[in-house]
Amino acid sequence: MNNLAEKKCIPCSLGTPPLSSDEIKRYISQLHEEWKVINDHHLEREFKFKNFKEALSYTNVIGQLAEKEGHHPDMLLSWGKVKITLFTHKIDGLSESDFVFAAKVDKQQSE
């Protein structure tokens, strides 16, 4: 889908500004259409599954990806669905790494 998935998540330094609205628009266009930008602050996408067990298994897959990348999303697990929320806590907003991680999630979904 894009080359964002080939990049690495890189930690931000304190004081790094969050992405601008224009930068966010450029990055979001490279992700699956189900990703939503909320208040120019975070990304969200909900994934649906047949049951709780499959949803739980998916959180573990994404958890392994998060550990590998050193970038950790918020995940809300409920029956048959997982909502992933991404933003960079250190800068309280979106960074390139949030979009890189989202692209890696998209790639994981397509495999």
From Swiss-Prot:
It comes from Alkaliphilus metalliredigens (strain QYMF). One of its GO terms (molecular function) is 4-alpha-hydroxytetrahydrobiopterin dehydratase activity. It catalyses: (4aS,6R)-4a-hydroxy-L-erythro-5,6,7,8-tetrahydrobiopterin = (6R)-L-erythro-6,7-dihydrobiopterin + H2O. This is Putative pterin-4-alpha-carbinolamine dehydratase. Keywords: Lyase. PANTHER family: PTERIN-4-ALPHA-CARBINOLAMINE DEHYDRATASE-RELATED. CDD domains: PCD_DCoH_subfamily_a. Belongs to the pterin-4-alpha-carbinolamine dehydratase family. GO terms for biological process: tetrahydrobiopterin biosynthetic process. Its EC number is 4.2.1.96.
